[in-house]
Amino acid sequence: MKASLLNKLDVLSDRFEELTALLGDAEVISDQTRFRAYSREYAEVEPVVALYQQLIRVQGDLEGAQALLKDSDPDMREMAVEEVRETKQQLVELEAQLQRMLLPKDPNDGRNVFLEIRAGTGGDEAAIFSGDLFRMYSRYAERRGWRVEILSENEGEHGGYKEVIARVEGDSVYGKLKFESGAHRVQRVPETESQGRIHTSACTVAVLPEPDEQQAIEINPADLRVDTYRSSGAGGQHVNKTDSAIRITHLPSGIVVECQEERSQHKNRARAMSWLSAKLNDQQTSAAANAIASERKLLVGSGDRSERIRTYNFPQGRVTDHRVNLTLYSLDEVLAGGVDAVIEPLLAEYQADQLAALGE
């Protein structure tokens, strides 16, 4: 293992001892904010240090086995050869595990997200495909026990959505969906196509982590224009009686968000403000992410919304992710919510990129 990584592990071991002492300190215990912060850090550091201690023990075992290779007893030497082989293999596996654990954590991975799906080129077909994508993500969320809440929707004339915005809540939502941002292309024969010709349409997907209070950008109320209107969404007669829907325009950036699904104007406003904060955060961070990805020539993780990331070919039953040259002939399963078949190879590729950078 590289000296730089061993140095990191030594630093973490020292920090682990510090945290152990701090969590037993009466002054820290009485301060719940500090106690929770140290507890979270302890939970992150402890498994790494435990694995590092195991690595050190196995290294000691290897040294002992290597010493036995010089034993005068041939049977002992034979046993030592086998032990050296097994111990070296164990060390390789432990080092690989530790390298993965040392990869930089994305602080947003555990967050809820705002999912934005918009029809692009292709007119009615693009809107119908937006509906297909929204159902795909909704079914995936259902499989993972997440909750999907539509904030705003603009339905297509022949089904689907011209635009649909949802909030997805659950464990590690952003960590799973963060590489879904980009242009999704569909190739299929529309029902109205009498000649059987394949049409190509596209939709864009954006996945924005929902910021917490610490992350939320401070927004000057003077920079906002707030409009109320009557919701066109679900909600029965009540929707027609009150102007509960909210549209907020951030004047400096021109960003517009709206929420119309809640019956309470107060709830709609709170959701819209959270979404606006996510979009402003994304605006700040995406430029930096693109620069890093470009510098390291990364295909996964750039988050470029204009990048064509995936093609769904209905006649062939094929899904192709262009970033990792992945092709699957299981379109129906993917659209039914089996998105992990595409997501897991992307996460593996991203992790490989991180490991390469860690070793530089």
Curated annotation (Swiss-Prot):
Q: Which UniProt keywords apply?
A: Cytoplasm, Methylation, Protein biosynthesis
Q: What SUPFAM superfamilies does the record point to?
A: Release factor (SSF75620)
Q: Does the keyword Cytoplasm apply?
A: yes
What are the N5-methylglutamine sites (modified residues) in this protein? 237
* A cellular component annotation (GO) from this entry: cytoplasm
- Report the SMART domains cross-referenced here: PCRF
Q: Which residues form a coiled coil?
A: none
| Job of this protein | Peptide chain release factor 1 directs the termination of translation in response to the peptide chain termination codons UAG and UAA.
Family listed: Belongs to the prokaryotic/mitochondrial release factor family.
State the name under which the record lists this protein: Peptide chain release factor 1
- Lineage, highest ranks first: Bacteria, Pseudomonadati, Pseudomonadota, Gammaproteobacteria, Pseudomonadales
